[in-house]
């Protein structure tokens, strides 16, 4: 009798315990330790978490990045400078009259910004000799801020005026050099022993250009992409031969637009990014930060978008270059709200807080895969918002 009663009581006890486990735990606070269950929320709508937001331009040259930009779109202008390598030291006796034909060869890429009606881009351009030294560190202002005459010979040595088809694989653009171009090449052959005085050529878009087109060039450390090439057919000692010079120095120079005052812009090519200052003084000294979200609205009507989709991801990183890489974050685009939202900035704010900073600065920029391969612009109107979910740790 007592044995059966004991078994029955045990079964009832198990049933009671099992029924008590059927309720799912609450998702709010379930991941937090017992001493951190008093959660608090700070919102930038109530507390001045965002101290300031502004656009800044980074002086980052577009040198051997894999893409060259050439053309015009609105007030944006893109030029190309090329310096050629592998000029042999055996052609000093070749004159301009010995050069039968000289052709600059460029490989178009699929990307274009501007008018692409009819499946082609209209990017007429001229080729000019460069008359002074330029390095991979050069930017637009260091070359053209005071006009073209200080950097370029204003007499063109070749020109292109035909539409360039927009295809995944387009025929190369081949530009014949004129007699002045032949004379320039003969001068290069004579100067080969002092190649520092060979400054290369510039490709300058005509005012009638209606788009900016991308062309291929070498990426640093990668030799697979086609290079701009100068093909020279010449006669020497009664024989005709061909010389091919590769564009070892290839750089784009983009004149930034002057309409950025008071605007928040992200734009590759001209390297616009946004700097945001976050105030931390509203957080208790021993706060534990659990979640931080930044909401970034966009103005799609003010976008400049080429023939590729605009970037759906933004990169957020601390302005302090000494900060660890793991605290970087990303924001993804939500079409329903026309905004980007971060996954979490908790690690970044926790880093600032642990280093006793009352203000932290973060940079919003485009991801690396589009930073040098496009000229698209993303416009951010005022109205960024931030929320911080935190708890207070027990006082010691």
Region spans (language model):
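Secreted, disulfide-rich extracellular signaling modules
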Residues: 2-6, 10-11, 18-396
């Amino acid at each position: 009798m007592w044995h059966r009663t004991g078994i029955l009581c045990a079964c009832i006890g198990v049933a009671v315990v099992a029924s008590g486990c059927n309720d799912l735990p609450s998702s709010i606070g379930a991941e937090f330790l017992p001493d951190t269950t008093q959660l608090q929320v700070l919102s930038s709508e109530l507390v001045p978490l965002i101290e300031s937001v502004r656009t800044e331009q980074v002086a980052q040259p577009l040198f051997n990045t894999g893409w060259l930009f050439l053309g015009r779109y609105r007030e944006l202008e893109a030029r190309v400078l090329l310096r050629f390598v592998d000029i042999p030291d055996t052609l000093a006796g070749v004159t301009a009259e010995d050069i039968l034909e000289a052709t600059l060869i460029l490989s178009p890429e699929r990307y274009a910004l501007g008018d692409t009606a009819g499946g082609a881009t209209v990017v007429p351009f001229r080729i000019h000799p460069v008359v002074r030294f330029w390095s991979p560190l050069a930017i637009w202002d260091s070359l053209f801020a005071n006009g073209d005459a200080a950097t370029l010979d204003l007499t063109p040595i070749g020109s292109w005026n035909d539409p360039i088809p927009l295809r995944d694989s387009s025929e190369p653009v081949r530009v014949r050099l004129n007699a002045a171009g032949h004379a320039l090449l003969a001068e290069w052959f004579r100067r080969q022993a002092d190649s520092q005085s060979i400054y290369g050529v510039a490709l300058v878009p005509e005012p009638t250009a209606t788009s900016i087109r991308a062309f291929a060039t070498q990426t640093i450390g990668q030799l697979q992409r086609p290079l701009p090439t100068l093909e020279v057919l010449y006669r020497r000692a009664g024989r005709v031969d061909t010389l091919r010079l590769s564009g070892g120095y290839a750089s784009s120079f983009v004149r930034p637009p002057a309409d950025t005052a008071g605007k928040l812009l992200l734009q590759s090519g001209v390297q616009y990014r946004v700097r945001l200052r976050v105030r931390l003084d509203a957080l208790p000294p021993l706060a534990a930060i659990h979640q931080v979200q930044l909401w970034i609205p966009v103005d799609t009507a003010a976008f400049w978008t080429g023939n590729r989709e605009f970037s759906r991801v933004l990169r957020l990183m601390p302005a302090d270059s000494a900060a660890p890489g793991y605290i970087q974050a990303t924001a993804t685009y939500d079409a329903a709200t026309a905004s980007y939202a971060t996954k979490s900035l908790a690690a970044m704010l926790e880093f600032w807080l642990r280093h006793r900073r009352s203000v932290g600065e973060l940079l919003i920029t485009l991801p690396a895969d589009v930073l040098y391969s496009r000229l698209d612009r993303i416009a951010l109107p005022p109205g960024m918002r931030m929320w911080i979910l935190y708890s207070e740790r027990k006082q010691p």
